[in-house]
């Protein structure tokens, strides 16, 4: 089950500025066992997030819980190959969630390793 917003006001989102967003706060994990923290700003698409979720579910089984703190709410559009210029914006290629520096992406608790 790939994550993406089910209902949006517009099918294709507007372009955003290409600046890196830096947080002034240091984020700490809420659940205190293990956490994955981003070292740089970047993007995680919905396939990468789903792969992370499936792998953790398989490894943890019923021992522990995990929380994903990222959600893919922005999209990238692209026209198909061989299509001429114009005639509107292209179709949605994939959804992604932006990650800024120092943000907790994932938290794990209750595992024995």
Regions picked out by a protein language model, each given a short descriptive name:
Residues 1-113:
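Ribosome-associated RNA-binding proteins
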